[in-house]
Amino acid sequence: MKESIHEDLNMRARERHGKDMINDSYFYDFRSNIYGGQMPVEFQRMFLAGDGNELVAKACAVHSSSMLGYNFFHWIKEYPLTIRWSDRKEVTYNQVCFEEKMPVLVGTTPANMDIVLRNQNEDVLFIESKFLEYTNSNRFKLSPTYNEPRKYYTKGVQWGHLISSIDTKLPTQYWEGIVQEIRHLIAITNWIEGKTDVGGYWYQGIGDVRFIHLVFEPKEVYSEHSAFLAYKERYSELHAKLEENNLVPSALKMEFMTYSDLWKIVRDMDNLPKPLKDYLDSHYMVFAK
């Protein structure tokens, strides 16, 4: 029987921070779950403004996706992150926002984009981040409102067709990430096509625009690795349907990326402090493929 990454993550956390943990997998305080033990007020406000009550509950989990994202990106203003994309374009990002609210449907609750990076050239990178959420199971479920074309800012009929084409009778697996991907893509499409005003900070013009699904891939020795592969397959199936229905704006470039891919870039940054690299490695990447 294969090992569980959840068990190894929890065991390593207890070894380091046992006195700071309320049980096997949760800290008393989110500060025990971040590099340096302190979060700037500007970032605290971003997380507290989201809908997930992130800093009070979710961020205290050893397996917190939001704190994984925070630890990997909060520093880019001081140490800009340069990514060479698959289309060979190189982009440097030096601004970050967490839990950015973006309108999806008319008169409904906005989506919270996990991470948004940008730079002075108005290049924007939207990130949907996943740690180990895909090891859970749930059915594909979107509000009935998504079947009403009039509720969309644009392409309501096409979106409704795509959503209805997804087989809700498939075996129970992790579908929430696919639902979030759809909601976020609708929001980004609204933004690119100028259908919504998302409020001053991000919408100042558009340069290079990308949307990545950034997912943590466990080592193959872990039983959860098969769930990662299944989730990646569902993502690929969704993107085939997106292309079939002509729903991805031509200005938007989309990719599936793992934290291991990102780590190869981050660990080779000469100016990034070694203690930060060591933290990312020991807390996360030693468990990754």
Residues covered by each model-derived region:
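Charged, terminal alpha-helix-loop-beta segments
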Residues: M1-K289
